[in-house]
């Protein structure tokens, strides 16, 4: 099974950069997009809804031009869930989940903690609730793949120039500790399972020439670690300030 994920920084903007033909040529079984900044019904191009995929969108209830997630599924899921049951966050359109018999795939956009548009205290509040949720579902007899823009990096090798800067977005002590705790408690970074030493980056918050950070990944149940066959970051084309992450798993939905 191939899972592709990307923070698009606006679906229609990314489409104007060539996203649509590229993304549907990657032979992905699941495509997770974040920060779509649109409603499903505002997308005017038919090419965004190929017959080979079932498309699902979660919009910001109050303003669809903010946040938003999407999942494209080659095989129809058993169920689709919007939100995580977090009363302060579900209306923001930051989580969408596809359930299959033994596997759940989520498309997640962690609230930004970067000023001027983000608030670190809000982000940390969301992460606190997410941690409790992930620990609760960890014991379920199913595997989880959470694709998204986490806006966090854990190790120095995941942040370019980490030794020279103290203001790297997503690289605060609190955020790194949160990820470290998650990885000790039954979850793993799918990219690092396949590429333990590869210094790749997925987000350039200050533009193409700025230092990169690997904040985009697929966080998986520990039980899936042995199923990760390969992982890559695609940088040949630019669709947004983020790069697509592609992971192949030795599993069947």
Each language-model region and where it sits:
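Metal-dependent phosphoesterases centered on the DNase I-like endonuclease/exonuclease/phosphatase
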Residues: 51-54, 126-211
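Surface-exposed cleft-lining segments at the edges of enzyme active sites
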Residues: 84-86, 110-127, 163-167
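Structured beta-strand-rich core segments of catalytic domains in phosphoester-bond hydrolases
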Residues: 36-113
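Catalytic metal-binding/acid-base residues of hydrolase active sites
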Residues: 9, 36-37, 109-111, 151-153, ...
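N-terminal, active-site-proximal structural segment of metallo-dependent hydrolase catalytic domains
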Residues: 1-48, 61-66, 253
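Active-site-proximal beta-strand elements of phosphoester/diester hydrolases
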Residues: 1-9, 102-114, 147
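Conserved beta strand-loop-helix elements of the APE1-like EEP
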Residues: 64-80, 206-227
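Surface polyanion/phosphate-binding segment centered on an Asp-His-Pro turn
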Residues: 234-253
């Amino acid at each position: 099974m191939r899972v592709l994920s990307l923070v698009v920084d606006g679906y229609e903007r990314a489409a104007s950069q060539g996203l649509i033909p590229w993304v549907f040529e990657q032979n992905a079984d699941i495509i997770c997009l974040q920060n779509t900044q649109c409603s499903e019904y505002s997308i005017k191009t038919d090419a965004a809804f190929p017959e080979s995929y079932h498309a699902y969108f979660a919009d910001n209830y109050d303003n669809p031009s903010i946040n938003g997630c999407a999942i494209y599924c080659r095989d129809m899921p058993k169920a689709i869930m919007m939100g995580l049951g977090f009363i302060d966050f579900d209306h923001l359109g930051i989580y969408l989940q596809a359930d299959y018999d033994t596997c759940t795939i989520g498309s997640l956009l962690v609230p930004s903690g970067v000023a001027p548009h983000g608030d670190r205290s809000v982000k940390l509040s969301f992460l606190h609730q997410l941690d409790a949720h992930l620990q609760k579902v960890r014991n379920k007899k199913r595997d989880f793949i959470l694709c998204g823009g986490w806006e966090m990096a854990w190790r120095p090798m995941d942040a370019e120039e980490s030794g020279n800067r103290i203001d790297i977005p997503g690289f605060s002590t609190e955020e790194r500790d949160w990820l470290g705790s998650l990885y000790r408690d039954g979850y793993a970074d799918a990219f690092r399972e396949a590429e333990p030493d590869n210094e790749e980056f997925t987000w350039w918050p200050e533009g193409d020439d700025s230092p990169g950070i690997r904040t985009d990944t697929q966080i998986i149940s520990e039980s899936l670690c042995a199923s990760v066959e390969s992982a890559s970051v695609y940088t040949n084309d630019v669709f947004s300030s983020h790069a697509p992450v592609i992971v192949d798993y030795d599993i069947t939905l």
